[in-house]
């Protein structure tokens, strides 16, 4: 081994401080060196131990001066890979990467392999950083959803919104529409609005479930108005279906309120004959949104030619979808099928809203809707937590009336809603309570539309303290400030119970629900008790031990409710006499009219 080889081994991986050892650096030409014909002198200068052999002799006379110069011009010409095995990992140098000069003047040798590894590491860090950022973003969204009890199912889910101002930043909402929302008192979106609005704005079909009084109407009204953008003369471009006229009227009122100043023409079908002329084939088509019940719309569609055109509908919204999808007299499954077929536009999208999830509706949506997103707030089919719920055993049907009168004597905070099983029982209870000295009225399907509208208006205005009703008002109707709901007759299912008590405790306000039950209601108690317990309200221990009903038994109970004793305390003899007098009076009127005509 000569001095040249020794120097190469001693200098492997070393750093040279050019500033500190400038003389030596100049002498040994470290750094940016210009190699000339005197390269042999440089080699001689490295002969510290007086070894007189030339490089050519050492290399067997095969290496020329030009080859030596080429070797020195490569990176680390003075350095070679060590052939000895090393236990520790060290930086390896090759002869194809030039030396890098640090800012402090030192020279640091870097191999091409190491450079590639460093580049790969840097790229990996960048990649990891972007992945981490995306992961953090998703974690924040999941935390936000969990905080507000938002449960979402589907693919490629849109992010929820936290404020209505985000609609301006991300979706370019009309300034007037945004101002109307804020002026109406909606400062912060509710959980269902946080997720349902972005889903509909992305044009996705939706199945949404949220507790009663959680703002579902606004959740579909805002995206409809945003996506329609402005009024056009193409006919109806949005259709909202609800099970009752009272609920349809409420939705119509809310849509007009938040669309004020935007120019949208929002209509509701009051009388089918007038609607056929107004919306028929010869109409000007100067309308945008229609809110209606299924039966009135079906009547128009069956006309020849059809009394209404739905071929331009872009959004079909079904409110209280689980009720509308029911079979039998109380459901509208067949009517909905006809309405769906009438909406033939390729742009049509559908959204289903309800306070409860029905298995039939969910399965139908998965089979028939395209790339559907399912959104639910809180536990499925659960009662709203702002309602204090109580089960009250009254023994028999007679005990119900006694308990009702006891509540009146103790005093209550109106307004109060009282639910009964049938129209006949609603009339009977009304006649019993009218003599208790309280402002009471009744609403049911046998009353005229004008009477129903007047009753609802009086109840909203506070003129009526206690309103007796059937299941007609259990769906969707929003009465501001209802403090107490009394289930005079036990509901036929937990779903009906949830909708009934949902008339109180709305929009974050507190409310109370009292449910009377007798020995005859024992088969239905268990399912309702589970709902009450899930909401955090106490349930007697003995009720928890009751046997569960089979699904067939539940369906039978819903279709054929219990036969109950009459509420009326008036003896049957007097009731029959009153009926006879009524019939006699009607007959005498008919005779008088016939005489007048003759």
Swiss-Prot record:
Single GO MF descriptor: RNA binding
Binding residue positions for ATP: 210-217
Record key words, sorted: Acetylation, ATP-binding, Helicase, Hydrolase, Nucleotide-binding, Nucleus, Phosphoprotein, RNA-binding
Ranges where the record places region Disordered: 59-98, 578-598
Chief location: nucleus
Subcellular location: Nucleus, Nucleolus
Catalytic activity, as annotated: ATP + H2O = ADP + phosphate + H(+)
Occurrences of domain Helicase C-terminal (ranges): 386-547
EC number assigned by the record: 3.6.4.13
Motif Q motif mapped to chain: 166-194
Modified-residue entries (N6-acetyllysine), positions: 15
RNA-binding as UniProt keyword: yes
SUPFAM superfamilies: P-loop containing nucleoside triphosphate hydrolases
Pfam families, per the entry: DEAD, Helicase_C
Motif (DEAD box) on chain: 319-322
Superkingdom of source: Eukaryota
SMART domains in the cross-refs: DEXDc, HELICc
GO CC terms: nucleolus
Family the UniProt entry places it in: Belongs to the DEAD box helicase family. DDX52/ROK1 subfamily.
This protein's name: Probable ATP-dependent RNA helicase DDX52
